[in-house]
Structure formats: C-alpha cells, structure tokens
Amino acid sequence: MQKLKKINNYGLLVDLDGTIIQNDEFISTRVKRSVKKLSNHIPVSIVTGRGPQDVLKFSKLLNLYGPQYCENGTSVVDATSKKILDVSLISDDISSKIIKEFIYSEMEYLVVSDGKTYINSKE
C-alpha cells in the first residue's frame, strides 16, 4: 500500500465583517497583531461578501499579500497587483430565474452585482 504524503500546505481564511472588523470598520490592535503573527508563518486571506475595493483596503491595512476572496467567494483578487485573478459567476439566465423566484415568494434578498449591493428588505 502506498504511503500517503504529509500535506504541509496550510493557510487561514478569515471573514471580514464581524470577525476582523466590527460595525465601526476599525481593526483592533489585538487583531492586527494576531493576523501579523499568523501571516509570518502561513498565508492569510480575507473572504468577504464585500467587493474588491474593500478587500484590497483591509488586506493592505493587515499587510496581507496574495489572493483575497470577495463578492462571497465569486471573485479572487491579488492583494499585491490589485488584479482580479478569477471570477466565477452565475449566468444571467439562472440569476434572472432566481431573482424572479425571490420576488414571487416575497422573500428578502441581497444581490451583489458589479461591486454594488442591492437589498430587498421587509423593513
């Protein structure tokens, strides 16, 4: 039987809102210190529902380099070059069907499109 190789690839994916930052959009000294300590040993990336501009802003504040994940994981942006590395979106046809179902069911929904967020709230 073949031996399994030990995998030495580790990384940390962290949420932005409610984890790295609170409502005031401030990163505490404790969080900055902890992220810096971790990023000296393993790759650290932000994963957020926000757009590329925000993920780049906060990755810069945390001195994170490499891929960062935004728009609920549909887009990958390089923190160094600021270039979009990959985008995986739902087709327009399927998106339209989903939105029609939300409207028909009178459910609340949040849609991110082209870096803008649209919310249909009952409030």
Question: What are the residue ranges of the model-derived segments?
Answer:
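Short helix N-cap motif at coil->helix boundaries in the Bergerat
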Residues: 22
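Active-site phosphate-binding/coordination module
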Residues: 26-123
